[in-house]
A protein has these predicted regions:
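Well-ordered beta-sheet/strand-loop patches within structured domains
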Residues: 1-219
């Protein structure tokens, strides 16, 4: 019982909200690559590529076909790119940082590290595209692996330093709940109120105030 570990996080912007869900964490990816999701490709990446021909090189992003074959970005009409994928190579500037923490879900979201650690100092951190960025993510990874002989901090640091991408399955899945609460009570009974960043409180309040349906007559 009680809190074993806690950390600051960043969640999705209001127009790319982090979903509510239940799942189980089942694997970790150290030194992950990042395949850019279609929405981010269309709304964020393409405008930047059109403005700056060096953007892909600077961000260490490769262009590949749907089958995984490399494509030459100089040969692509970025106003009509067709079917392709952008994949950011593993490394210190990768958007997922040094580890991604994965669990089955239909939204294709996950927890992950980030190279932009300074953003955790912001008071309002609804700035991601739906996934959850976690401060001290490598520490969380060590706790999830729960194997101090094989996966102590030194072993994790060595793997990260190698730069090699590696998938590690958890010996025991860890339950995960993503919820959205704008009111919370801490262990001392202190109530705190948070901004309703996704504008959901009005619908919840309306549902709570709705009269209960009349009970069906018994026979």
């Amino acid at each position: 019982d009680g809190t074993l570990w806690q950390s600051r996080i960043m969640v999705g912007r209001p127009y790319r909200s982090t979903p509510m869900l239940r799942s189980e964490i089942n694997r970790l990816t150290f030194n992950p690559t990042w395949t850019v999701p279609p929405t981010i490709l269309r709304e964020d990446m393409l405008p930047m590529i059109r403005k700056d021909p060096d953007y892909l090189t600077r961000e260490d992003i490769e262009v590949i076909s749907l089958s995984g074959a490399p494509l030459d970005p100089r040969q692509i009409d970025w106003w009509h790119p067709g079917n392709l994928l952008l994949r950011q190579r593993a490394g210190p500037h990768n958007a997922l940082g040094r580890v991604a923490i994965r669990f089955p879900n239909r939204h294709d979201v996950y927890l992950h590290d980030t190279p932009a650690q300074g953003l955790f100092n912001l008071d309002r951190r609804a700035i991601s595209s739906g996934c959850i960025r976690v401060a001290n993510a490598l520490e969380l990874a060590r706790l999830l692996l729960d194997d101090e002989k094989k996966w102590n901090q030194a072993a994790i640091d060595e793997l990260v330093a190698s730069g090699l991408t590696r998938e590690v399955a958890l010996a025991r899945r860890v339950p995960l709940i993503l919820y959205y609460w704008t009111v919370a009570v801490d262990a001392e009974g202190v109530v705190s109120f948070r901004p309703d960043i996704y504008q959901r409180d009005a619908a919840v309040l309306a549902a709570l105030n709705r009269p209960l349906a009349a009970a069906a007559p018994s026979h």
